[in-house]
UniProtKB/Swiss-Prot annotation:
Chain segments annotated as coiled-coil in the UniProt record: none
Protein's GO biological process: ADP-L-glycero-beta-D-manno-heptose biosynthetic process
Role this protein plays: Catalyzes the ADP transfer from ATP to D-glycero-beta-D-manno-heptose 1-phosphate, yielding ADP-D-glycero-beta-D-manno-heptose.
Region named Cytidylyltransferase: 345-476
Protein family membership: In the N-terminal section; belongs to the carbohydrate kinase PfkB family.
Superkingdom to which the source organism belongs: Bacteria
Organism, scientific name: Shewanella baltica (strain OS155 / ATCC BAA-1091)
Gene label: hldE
Pathway the protein contributes to: Nucleotide-sugar biosynthesis; ADP-L-glycero-beta-D-manno-heptose biosynthesis; ADP-L-glycero-beta-D-manno-heptose from D-glycero-beta-D-manno-heptose 7-phosphate: step 1/4; Nucleotide-sugar biosynthesis; ADP-L-glycero-beta-D-manno-heptose biosynthesis; ADP-L-glycero-beta-D-manno-heptose from D-glycero-beta-D-manno-heptose 7-phosphate: step 3/4
Quaternary assembly: Homodimer.
Protein name: Bifunctional protein HldE
GO CC term (a single one): cytosol
HAMAP family: HldE
Organism lineage: Bacteria, Pseudomonadati, Pseudomonadota, Gammaproteobacteria, Alteromonadales
GO function terms (MF aspect): ATP binding; heptose 7-phosphate kinase activity; heptose-1-phosphate adenylyltransferase activity; phosphotransferase activity, alcohol group as acceptor
Amino acid sequence: MKVSLPAFEKARVLVVGDVMLDRYWVGPTGRISPEAPVPVVKINQVEDRPGGAANVALNIATLGGQVQLAGLVGQDDTAHALTLGVQTLGVEPQWLTIADKPTITKLRVLSRNQQLIRLDFEEAFDKADSVRLLKQSEALLDSVDVVVLSDYAKGAIDQPRDFIALARAKGVMVLVDPKGSDFGRYQGASLITPNMSEFEAVVGTVTSEADLLEKARGLLKQHHFDAILVTRSEKGMTLVTTNAPELHIPTVAREVYDVTGAGDTVISALATSLAAGADLPQACAIANTAAGVVVGKLGTSTVSRIELIEALALHHGESGFGVVSEDQLAYALEQAKLRGERVVMTNGCFDILHAGHVSYLKQAKALGDRLIVAVNDDASVKRLKGDGRPVNQVDRRMAVLAGLASVDWVVPFSEDTPQRIITRLLPNLLVKGGDYKLEDIAGGAEVIAAGGQVQVLGFEDGISTTAIIQNIMANQ
């Protein structure tokens, strides 16, 4: 399957569920306690990370999506720490504070990358608290495209069927990370994502692939789900829908250090991808890749867009580079600059790619870390070059350019000049081939005003698209 990332910044997601704080005490251990046969850990690091539904929201925000988070918290310092943790990445918390209950906290003691013990601080919330939370969340449905219900069976999501029905009536997809043996609580959901243990807790032991598919289809029919994605650890994922053949996606995890939060990563990547316009098989492939990244980290963690791009390049032959939309490129360029990479940009028709082009693009790439090539679409080439041009359609021209080792991104534009797209992207260095004066280069003034540079490179003499066309015509 060819996998490419959608424009995650367009995703608008609401996460409702059991929020918690994952607290880590970390330090070395070198002796056994004289009081009991247990290791003594000398704590030298304390770290708080949002967990549960809050980790789902952070994953969405890290990918670039817009996310609101609704959950139950206590009136305590832990709630304050949780609020700070999610706001750091731009998540909008919509808490319902329950004064007589603590904010759920999971304290883990780690040494040498191994978890020694976990201590839970929590009390079950009342059913009335869940009713109030879901009612409060209804007001947020008009501002989102996808809702995630992140259920850890702590009381935030007790009976969500009416909430699901209302969301679906408004055209909002509802994804559920389920818990417990009664999937009927989530009736009408767009998609549920049980792991294999959760799935078998509802349908019984799965004896074969055919048995899994039969039982999954039974759940679809019984509870009016549109789809079920069963996550299966080392066996990957299986997607079963009401209107298409099943889809098996093999795991891409190379090393597994910690499965904490892997389910959160799956549903967050699904939600962000679907809200950004990806179809369901694409979203599942992206989620599977994201899960493969996060299990290679220790503790509750998120996956960045850049990590996802690199993993897709490794496992799918798709890097998030190559031919991209303008929106995708704007995001990728922002991330490249954050990594300290120097981005070079050039433009042209590149109708018949020749040795002069290849040499020029190689020179341009040598001036930085990344090279963008903006390509005139077919209509603009015809306006600039006349009838009979372009010889090659824009998708073919871009595909050839994307195949060059020197080129990182190829993006089309429809205007006669690249002024608008250059002004939007503002590379570190804008280059142009030929005998241009710097002041005549489209977008040059804007790049310089933003702190960038403009440079003119020479073309190889005697090589041009026009000359090639004339030579072909003369030899017919």
